[in-house]
Amino acid sequence: MTAAALIHGRNAVLEAARAGKVVKVFQAAGLGHDPRLDELARLAPIEVVPPERLEAIAAGVHQGVAAELKPRREWTLKELLATNPSLLVALDGIMDPQNLGAILRSAEVAGADGAILPEHRSAPLSPSAVKASSGASELLRIAHVSGIPSAIAEVKRAGIWCAALDVRGETAPWDFDLTQPVCIVVGSEGEGVHRLVRERCDVRLRLPVAGHVSSFNASAAAAALLYEVLRQREGSGRTRP
């Protein structure tokens, strides 16, 4: 079993099981009652294992549960764009798996149709990232691309606006129409969105701050902007069915 095929954590495993992505659940012997475990037992085969075996196969805080996943479908960007998405998220240089997972979770909660990740200069979809996403990574269509700049150009050719989160941006999110098809581009904590990516985006959106710290972290900023997308779309009646 490869690391990429294994996830851990009760919420992440449960969401993957609800989506029909789980082959088998490994559950440590002696766990107390939890309704999530009851639901898991109805959704997927359970193998009760000694706690030390679970420690050996599941790194990190696993909460007594790990799962083997079915192979994740690999989407190309062309296939993703053929689904006529109204909301995409592109991640430019997100190297921390916790940030990666948190952004994917926010994207799925906000109704995103998919995510675009670079093949290089990105944290992998590791068990830690999947756990941080609470299983959202197993629900989203995810396309890996050779480079974000060329991907942005392709997204724009499909008629989708590209909006970069940028601390030096000139536009507040509520001053931009986020009800139209849009791809939100999120950069890394230190560097932000890279220059060539920024230049190819249609608009740079800035989240105003009132404190002494200059910016939100990447996952918090993404969550705030994705919430604004959802707020505008609910107000216009254009949320995804």
Residue locations for each model-derived region?
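Structured adenosyl-cofactor binding patch, chiefly the S-adenosyl-L-methionine
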Residues: 14, 19, 109, 131-136, ...
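RNA substrate-binding interface of SAM-dependent RNA methyltransferases
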Residues: 83-171
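Short basic, glycine-rich beta-strand/loop surfaces that mediate nucleic-acid
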Residues: 59-70, 133-136, 179-187
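Short secondary-structure boundary segments
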Residues: 10, 29, 93, 119, ...
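N-terminal positively charged helical leader segments and presequences
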Residues: 1-82, 241
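Short, ordered loop/turn segments at secondary-structure junctions
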Residues: 30-31, 51-54, 120-122, 147, ...
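Active-site/ligand-binding-proximal alpha/beta "capping" segment
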Residues: 163-217
